[in-house]
Amino acid sequence: MRFIPGLLLSAALLTAAPLAFAEERTAFELQAREIYQTVVEIRSAKGQGNVPVVVDYIVRELKAGGFADADIEVTDYEIEDELVQGLMVWYRAEGTPKQKPIVLLAHMDVVDALPDTWTRYPFELIEENGYFFGRGTADNKYGVTSLVATFLRLKAEGFKPDRDLVMILSGDEETGMISTRAQAKYTDEKIKPAYVLNADAGGLSLDENGKPLLYGVQGAEKTYATFELTVSNPGGHSSTPRVDNAIYELADALKKIEAYKFPVMHSPLTLASFKSAGAQTPGPLGEAMLAFAKNPADEAAIAALRANPETVGSTGTTCIATMLRAGHAENALPQRATATINCRIFPGVGIAATEQTLKEVVGNDGVTFKLISDLVESPESNLPDEVMAAIAKALAARGLEGLPILPHMSSGGTDGLFYRNLGYDTLGIDGSGAKPNDTFAHGLNERLSVDSFFGGLDHWYIVLKDLAGAE
């Protein structure tokens, strides 16, 4: 799941900057496009059994590009009777490593797409009107392509890093994250990196005209937690209604949750985000960002930020009803009514404390709570100076020297949360960028601009050469 600077853009909006469109593509660019097309056209959604197909293709490309069998590890996971695989690839240091390894993340799976609801077939890479269309073009097949193509490019050029670079591609980030958990555990036990860099978050934020506004570094993620709230009742015949009713009782609980506002929260990272984003955002919203950054108790600023879907998540915990099911027949009183509540919890609050708050808000012991998610909590990451300097170098190479680099917190979760939970600074620093509401990740007609695709390919190349000992 892609997450980019949430103060200006919602999740999954950023994909590489539209710099000059090259008439002639380099061999590297053409190779990257071929990789992109191949992985996008593999339907690697849950239930399709195709993640191993993606793995097989990438492994063949890497071996053809000079990576040895010993550099590649494929791991198998059986998830709900489906074989899912993860992939780890080592670009090993020349001789004795001079520094701790760097781990690089992306995910090979996608949210499924129903072909009959799309304007174009979602599992064919279609280039049209300056865009690449297809499921995963933004989330996260571009991240996969960028890392794989960069490894191949560096290997072809004979680059010899002074530290190990370890590319870790998960196979079920969009669902249970079983492969993610196992890979994070392995990383902690065997690799012990200096830090982790994620290609599924971060990137350039562009205005409506395509002008870069800032580069976002994802340094934190809110904790994901989903609860089921259930009311049970003896039920009966609808012609003899009871005074109590499971649906009405659940509805009362939901209305209380709707009315409740979690406390306003902030951190140095979110205040810095609001300050930087506010300077780039025109009108009342930008003014509210700046006011909140200056004084997080400013009630007018809080009201403005919480009224905007793009900024409310950065002001505290949110819990929202997302699903309902109740009853078993149209002429029977409901014996059970269940609602699903999805929470995005501000770092440091915790899942248990959030559940307790919801119970107090509902104030009805007849409403039972069940936590149905099992994701971990993760702290904010530090921002290593060498990573920030490498990003600045990559931006300068793209003609964006001096562009503000903004740390931010994502309202959703990526593979990175498991690495943060284990104590590793994990930064989303993809080379992508897009205008607001322009990629439709997880939605219909997902796309990424062609200029964006090619404009961001050098990003990881420059960053990794800088961090791993450019020659």
Role assignments for model-derived ranges:
Residues 16-17:
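N-terminal signal peptide c-region/cleavage motif recognized by signal peptidases
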Residues 45-99, 123-126:
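A non-catalytic alpha/beta surface segment that caps or lines the substrate-entry region
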Residues 97-169:
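Active-site metal-coordination/substrate-binding segment of hydrolases
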